[in-house]
């Protein structure tokens, strides 16, 4: 049974401005440490935009937004063995998922020229 669903569209230009102004410091504010290690040097802005879209969709699925002690670094976008994005929740985000009775997550992520979009589904 679906216990939460969230969707987000992130403008890549908005992320590019943060990256241009703050660089690595910007990335470390929104990425989990495991994501920082996986961030490509070739196109970090698209990577950041995609990860941010998933994180926004995830907090919508959790029903909290970025509040109640849940921040972007509590949500990690990992990579499943087949290469698909995989949600890994930490801290209060993981506790909220457990409180909802969710045991599985589903993530879809796509990039366009100007936007990144993501859908997150939490399932019990």
Curated annotation (Swiss-Prot):
Record's catalysed reaction(s): apo-[ACP] + CoA = holo-[ACP] + adenosine 3',5'-bisphosphate + H(+)
NCBIfam families noted in UniProt: acpS, pantethn_trn, PRK14657.1
Protein name, UniProt field: Holo-[acyl-carrier-protein] synthase
Cofactor(s) in the UniProt record: Mg(2+)
Function: Transfers the 4'-phosphopantetheine moiety from coenzyme A to a Ser of acyl-carrier-protein.
Subcellular location: Cytoplasm
GO molecular function term, any single one: holo-[acyl-carrier-protein] synthase activity
The EC number(s) this enzyme carries: 2.7.8.7
One Pfam assignment: ACPS
Tree of life domain: Bacteria
